[in-house]
Amino acid sequence: MSVEAERAAYVQKLDRAPRRIVELLAQLDGVERVSLFGSYAQGRRDLFTDLDVLVVWKTDRALLERLRSLYSLLDVAVDMDVICYTPAEFEEMKDRPFLRQVLREEVLLFEKKPS
């Protein structure tokens, strides 16, 4: 397979992945928000592009257990980095430079409306 064909196939997978991520995470009890940030959210599409995913999940699980659960659930066939905060952690981190940058550039995929 040529590099161009490989790139085209990977870009197709990249472009299908956000919908799949939403399908999987919207079913998970307690997930309140899912967004993309980073190179994909900024429009980059090549073999070096990964998906940077921010998840806000209302759960009592510890951070490593949250991440382990999310990575095992999110089988999307592309490179992916996941950041997961509880709602309290998300509120606490909003004023920190990293999360401020993420929120400026994010593409919101899913947000649970308050009941």
What is each PLM-predicted segment?
Residues M1-R33, A41-F48, W57-S115:
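Catalytic core of pol beta-like nucleotidyltransferases
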Residues D52-V53:
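Structural signature of the urease/amidohydrolase superfamily beta/alpha-barrel
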